[in-house]
Amino acid sequence: MSKIVKVIGREIIDSRGNPTVEAEVHLHGGFIGLAAVPSGASTGSFEALELRDGDKSRFLGKGVTKAVSAVNGPIAEALIGNNAKYQECIDKIMIKLDGTENKSQFGANAILAVSIATAKSAAASKGIPLYEHIAELNGTAFQFSMPLPMINIINGGKHADNNIDIQEFMIQPVSAKTIKEAIRIGAEVFHYLAKVLKANGMHTTVGDEGGYAPNLDSNTEVLDLITEAVEKAGYILGKDITLAIDCAASELFDPLTNKYLLKGEGKIFTSQEFTDYLNILTKKYPIISIEDGLNESDWDGFMYQTKVLGNKIQLVGDDLFVTSAKILQQGIEKGIANSILIKLNQIGTLTETMAVIKIAKNAGYTTIISHRSGETEDTTIADLAVGTSAGQIKTGSMSRSDRLAKYNQLLRIEEQLGKKAPFNGLKEVQSQA
């Protein structure tokens, strides 16, 4: 019943209007798994390769027909007849067939789409939800938790057409007792923030991830507006709601001068000065998580940043670790950061992703399952967060259906699991920071 009989790839459109890969895996007995992969805007240098056509006559060169052809050709031929229940085996077949370290032959977008579709088809054949199947694959059957969300409410950097340098300003509803309550709190603050922005004569258009994207003079002005919105929504900042930021500092780094540029504020920092600047922000505002606080290659700087901030807050590696077991292990050995952002398409298979989560947890690092700025309606990351008990999830704001699809899936999962999947709130962040 779990034997693969057909694999189909197709080119579909993501939330930015760019092509991406969707795959179907069909099993004997009529079971089907469907998966679509996302795409990032600010990407780490060592991510698995997202294969694009480069044909400027189609989608400005961003077509994915080569990746789709890989799915419909060599990948399909290699997988037909194999058992979809053996996820690791399926993923290893594709990795070996690709034959490159960064999946550049077929593209991580092709391989990941099939990897996830395989897991979904196997879950369907077993008659169980995807999160339950993932927990079984993870060796943690029937062990679930609901993730604390990082809700993006103001976009900047590469995710918005504005002058804000820091890429994401997020809230975490830490006083919530359930994911349902956390989402409600997030939505309320999101709406009150719109009122605050309008009252200050600012527009409320949104960026790639659904957060508002106004033009503001400084990062502190952003944080002050969020503070006002939280208070007007009836919550206490630092008690009910905490803050998180994604600096995406590789995008702020100037390799010619080895300096960090906040163009919106007209400020220039050395590596140590930028960490000191972030430290000042954490003292003024209840920021308990900072992602990519320095350039991905600034490991000496990260050692200093971890020394200064690592015992106080969560320091998240995204571009720093790119969901790579090898790079994460190096970071652990050097004592860099204390948390990792998990993005399926940075590594390219479900099996490798779960392995990285295990390595991080065993080292005492927190794990945050994440979307990308170019998303689809696929909700796999919600199931992955619950099935691996990752602890936290980052999937955008309270607008754009590509973001809300994941939140709504979490609501369904919580309804299904009830007390079997506790919502641990702030404990998920504090356990390592």
Curated annotation (Swiss-Prot):
Keywords for this protein: Cytoplasm, Glycolysis, Lyase, Magnesium, Metal-binding, Secreted
Catalytic activity line of the entry: (2R)-2-phosphoglycerate = phosphoenolpyruvate + H2O
Origin: domain of life: Bacteria
Cofactor note: Binds a second Mg(2+) ion via substrate during catalysis.
SUPFAM superfamilies: Enolase C-terminal domain-like, Enolase N-terminal domain-like
A Gene Ontology cellular-component term: extracellular region
PROSITE patterns named among the record's database cross-references: ENOLASE
Keyword Cytoplasm recorded: yes
A molecular function GO annotation: phosphopyruvate hydratase activity
Residues that, per the record, bind (2R)-2-phosphoglycerate: 167, 343, 372-373, 394
Protein name: Enolase
